Amino acid sequence: MVMAHFVENFWGEKNNGFDVLYHNMKHGQISTKELADFVRERATIEEAYSRSMTKLAKSASNYSQLGTFAPMWDVFKTSTEKLANCHLDLVRKLQELIKEVQKYGEEQVKSHKKTKEEVAGTLEAVQAIQNITQALQKSKENYTAKCVEQERLKKEGATQREIEKAAVKSKKATDTYKLYVEKYALTKADFEQKMTETAQKFQDIEETHLIHIKEIIGSLSNAVKEIHLQIGQVHEEFINNMANTTIESLIQKFAESKGTGKERPGLIEFEECDPASAVEGIKPRKRKTFALPGIIKKEKDAESVECPDADSLNIPDVDEEGFSIKPEANQNDTKENHFYSSSDSDSEDEEPKRYRIEIKPAHPNNLHHTMASLDELKVSIGNITLSPAVSRHSPVQMNRNSSNEELTKSKPSSLPTEKGTNDLLAWDPLFGSSLESSSAPLTSSSSARPTTPLSLGTLVPPPRPASRPKLASGKLSGINEIPRPFSPPVTSNTSPPPTAPLARAESSSSISSSASLSAANTPTVGVSRGPSPVSLGNQDTLPVAIALTESVNAYFKGADPTKCIVKITGDVTISFPSGIIKVFTSNPSPAVLCFRVKNISRLEQILPNSQLVFSDPSQCDSNTKDFWMNMQAVTIYLKKLSEQNPAASYYNVDVLKYQVSSNGIQSTPLNLATYWKCSASTTDLRVDYKYNPEAMVAPSVLSNIQVVVPVDGGVTNMQSLPPAIWNAEQMKAFWKLSGISEKSDSGGSGSLRAKFDLSEGPSKPTTLAVQFLSEGNTLSGVDIELVGTGYRLSLVKKRFATGRYLADC
């Protein structure tokens, strides 16, 4: 049994205990409602997490089913689906708990209404004792005054009549005082009895309320505990499945499902060539005049076998790296010798083909003799694909690969004359100066893949992994390396919008002067870490920019710093280049964009965009908080923005809002105080300002400062220091200051003074407004960094500016 704390502690001289207890009972309804809101928000978070896990499980089904690792995706999918179901079960339990809390809240309201009627008598007793106490105090004071007056008249020797008159008044005051004392005693007894009963009733209500609330909280904690036990079981099951999936079983499963057979090739014995039968089987041969290379009708008799001698094989010589060595024989002679052939001959009966992949050194007679030899070497290397080196090819091997080789042969063998969109070699820092100075444009075929920048000693580019998809050259056509200030896109019918400020250049190499690199369907290529074209083949990261914008709102009342009201809010915006939309839409599961907000100790509240951003409410670090984005929702949102404004080069997405804790006038970067002196003919105004570096984490310059003061009374003339502008139509005075900082005169302190001559005075003091901004800094000191891989932060733009910054006298 709880002690009667309410009965013992809510009396007091002014008898306000009843009012305190009654309002405390009403606050119980607020607590119940807030608890329901808390559980509802938790359910929303769990539901969003469950949906994200479900999407992740579905995306696992779309991953590559090739290779020995493919069966592992089934384990991931099953585990992720179970985790999603666990969180979904928690959502259901929380929703049931919300209904229980709401039901209790309704019962609580009814109970409080009933209690209000029951304690109405106590309220009357409280009012009665408060009234009787005041009346008793007044009667006591009147009684004391009359007695003192009577004694004074006796001592001063007043007339008998005056003394008798004073005695009558004193007796009357005495009777009134005694009457109120008796009434107070009766009222006090009634008040104490009712107040004791009511205080105990209020305590019983609070005990019942707290017991019910604790039961609800216990249900909440048990539900969360059960779900976490299930999650632990899912993780244990995942660990066991991974342990049971051995490397041998994966390899065995791949061999059984993708195996091509267990029969090995048989032995083939050497057979002597019979010249007589070979001559009889030879048919006249004539080559088709318009036959295409590599496309030859096979009509050879199965019994006809040609056994060429060693000389007729004409196997090409190769060097140590697998490249064929060009013979000195003229190719025109070869064509003349084999112009006539059988129309139904097989490719084996044709001339032995010589396929060469050559790196030609610089030669005066070359097609591009004006180019530097180093340029030719680099471009040649950047556009060839090497097969494994072999020493010799048999005729059968040559013919087996004839279709691919003929296609290769059919391509132009001359050096490229134009730089391709994927030629990253051209922007290698080792070769930057020579390539920029070259006057001859370079190109590569459309099939050239992205290559890794090479050193001078590396001649063979490393092969690209086959499992990594290649992006088409137009995937990121909207990503351009043009550093610009962070600002919203501006649409116009006559000019394209400005390009997003995705990065600053990190290299001295310049690519903006090359007109051939800025075609409409060709992404710009560069060595800067800005928004250069991204290829999944070379594991590049996607550029994003972030803006931190804070707004300081303040109201100054006269020169009293205690009356200053301050509110500071902030916004976090992420800017995506327009070309990134194609990357997101072409990839069913783009990398999740995660970011961390640092230095949040001064923030009172953080509100993420619930439709696009998730966070972990269980994070215990008081100075940082991690967030991650719903990439499917972000993709849909960016596509919608793109449809609304397809010409925009980047799109801004609001992800966070926050409020900064303020400490009155100490949190304002510019302190203000106004003084007005109004008369019938003139008005004198003085505005004192003071730069406050303590409001900022790192003191910065306040720029574009404007002060606007409305003045009525029919201003006919204005004298001001520093000079101001008077707008007669708006009846306002305008001051413009270039900038204020610690390095300004008087440490950033000063005054604005003005005298106004009036024709219809006097003026009424009005509220003035101030505007300013500061670039590269925030008041809160909040910072942001990206977490994980897949993205890079090309730019962080920080600024704070005034919202409603007002001053009154």
Curated annotation (Swiss-Prot):
This is F-BAR domain only protein 2. Residues 87-156 form a coiled coil. It comes from Mus musculus (Mouse). PROSITE patterns: F_BAR, MHD. Residues 3-250 form the F-BAR domain. The keyword Coiled coil applies. InterPro entries: AH/BAR_dom_sf, F_BAR, FCH_dom, FCHo2_F-BAR, GMIP/FCHO2-like_FCH, MHD, Muniscin_C. Keywords: Coated pit, Coiled coil, Disulfide bond, Endocytosis, Isopeptide bond, Membrane, Phosphoprotein, Ubl conjugation. There is a cross-link at residue 297 (Glycyl lysine isopeptide (Lys-Gly) (interchain with G-Cter in SUMO2)). The modification Phosphothreonine is found at residue 385. Residues 520-809 are annotated as: Mediates interaction with DAB2, EPS15, EPS15R and ITSN1. It is found in: Membrane, Clathrin-coated pit. The modification Phosphoserine is found at residues 312, 387, 394, 402-403, 487, 492, 495, 507, 509-510, 532. Its main location: membrane. Residues 435-456, 501-520 have a biased composition (Low complexity).
